[in-house]
């Protein structure tokens, strides 16, 4: 009976949140921008929010990209006086974007690319494209669709549509045509965009060439929204990139890390490897953990090793699939390849063998939290459980300096402290002189 009552209460609370969210959306005078795509959407969201923050007041919702997150944001966030709301819409399965589109009713929708991520849920590129298109279909009358001109599945969303369309890409006919792409770490990404207003030269904080795509998408959207070209270029140059998305992590008198351990879909593994191949440092190492979203056999780990071996002085595989590399005994004996089971073992190995100035790529799906290997150079990392089950990164979690078995009590303690502080504020407000 108690369980039934709890369910009824939970349903009522959620319905109230949805009602408040819809009411807040209806009353808001902000320009709503929705961003989706198989990859790059988080960077577009963060960068576009950063650009618009130099032009007006902005609320940016990044990484928390579900309908529940959208409802919570709209129902709890005061949008009065906000000029722009930038929201990342993720697709974890079929019919997950449509509810967000219906709730958001965006003035602008951006689609970065269509790839076969979440393979189990979608199975085909056509199914992925159909899901992403739902954000375009949700545009308000007279809305703007910002589309990748180089992706046939994305550009197909331009027709049939009643909305304005702006395209970006390397295609000659793109409205925002990208040229002169260059990145070779430590040189950061630079490129040019040719558009109807002229040419905009961009200097970014990103270490890899493939970030031209999300940067171009954000720039195209900002220019279409009326942000001056000079302000766009200045804001792009000052962005603080998202943690663990090709994040540069430099240790004084120690190694340099590129942390790319938030996701590792098979379709984009080569982009991280290409970044390492272009880097102009003397010594390179690649640490590869879990690969996700691939069809076919686990020989993908073997293919990845063959590519990584041509780029790096040493390749380290870690996790439950480390044995699938196909590395020969000669490579193992020569130290070209190491097969380790846990992030802690990798951390210890790198600590013993690190060379000042070397570049180390940490690449994996988020389940292994390989970012701990780099964090251990600047923090006393005590959470070394191989797989903790948490989806957010270690920095966002904030408990990497606390042993995993103490996390629950630590979180409870923080909640109690927040409640007590709130209670004291209430008492203080009530006892102040009138």
Predicted regions and their residues:
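The start of beta-strands in P-loop NTPase/AAA+ ATPase cores
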Residues: 29, 83, 107-108, 143, ...
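Short, hydrophobic beta-strand segments that form beta-sheet elements in well-ordered domains
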Residues: 144-148, 164-169, 314-320
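Extended acidic/charged loop-beta regions that coordinate divalent cations
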Residues: 89-117, 155-201, 242-245
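ATP-dependent carboxylate-amine ligase
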Residues: 1-17, 162, 220-434
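Residues in the short beta-alpha loop(s) of Rossmann-like NAD(P)-binding domains
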Residues: 64, 150-151, 171, 290, ...
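A conserved, hydrophobic alpha-helical segment in the catalytic core
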Residues: 103-116, 203-241
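Phosphate-binding loop of NTP-binding sites
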Residues: 2-149, 153-162, 376-381, 385-386, ...
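Conserved RecA-like helicase motor-core motifs
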Residues: 56-63, 168-170, 335-338
């Amino acid at each position: 009976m108690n369980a039934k009552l709890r369910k009824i209460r939970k349903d009522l609370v959620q319905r109230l949140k949805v009602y408040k969210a819809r009411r807040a959306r209806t009353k808001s005078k902000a320009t709503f921008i929705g961003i989706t795509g198989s990859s790059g959407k988080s960077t577009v969201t963060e960068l576009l929010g950063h650009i618009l923050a130099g032009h007006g007041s902005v609320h940016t919702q990044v990484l928390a990209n579900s309908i529940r997150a959208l409802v919570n944001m709209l129902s709890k966030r005061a949008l009065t006086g906000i000029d722009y709301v930038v929201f990342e819409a993720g697709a974890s399965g079929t019919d997950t974007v449509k509810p967000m589109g219906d709730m958001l009713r965006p003035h602008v929708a951006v689609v970065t690319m269509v790839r076969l991520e979440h393979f189990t849920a979608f199975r085909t590129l056509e199914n992925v494209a159909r899901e992403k298109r739902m954000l375009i279909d949700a545009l308000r009358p007279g809305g703007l669709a910002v589309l990748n001109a180089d992706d046939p599945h994305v550009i197909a969303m331009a027709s049939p549509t009643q909305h304005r369309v702006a395209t970006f890409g390397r295609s000659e006919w793109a409205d925002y045509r990208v040229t002169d792409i260059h990145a070779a770490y430590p040189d950061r990404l630079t490129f040019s965009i040719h558009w109807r207003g002229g040419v905009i030269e961009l200097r970014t904080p990103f270490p890899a060439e493939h970030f031209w795509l999300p940067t171009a998408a954000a720039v195209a959207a900002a220019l279409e929204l009326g942000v001056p070209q000079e302000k766009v270029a200045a804001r792009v140059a000052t962005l603080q990139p998202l943690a663990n998305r090709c994040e540069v992590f430099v240790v004084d008198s120690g190694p340099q890390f590129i942390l790319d351990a938030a996701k590792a879909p098979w379709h984009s593994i080569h982009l991280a490897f290409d970044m390492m191949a272009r880097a102009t440092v003397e010594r390179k190492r690649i640490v590869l953990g879990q690969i996700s979203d691939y069809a076919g056999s686990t020989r993908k780990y073997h293919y990845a090793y063959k590519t990584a071996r041509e780029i790096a002085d040493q390749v380290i595989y870690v996790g439950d699939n480390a044995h699938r590399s196909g590395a020969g005994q000669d490579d193992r004996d020569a130290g070209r390849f190491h097969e380790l089971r846990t992030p802690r073992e990798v951390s210890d190995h790198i600590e013993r063998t690190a060379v000042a100035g070397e570049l180390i790529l940490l690449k994996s799906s988020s389940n292994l939290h390989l970012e701990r290997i780099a964090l251990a150079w600047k923090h006393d990392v005590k959470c070394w459980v191989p797989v903790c089950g948490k989806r957010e990164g270690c920095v966002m979690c904030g408990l990497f300096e606390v042993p995993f078995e103490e996390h629950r009590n630590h979180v409870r303690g923080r909640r109690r402290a927040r409640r007590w502080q709130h209670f004291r504020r209430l008492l203080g407000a009530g006892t102040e002189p009138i």
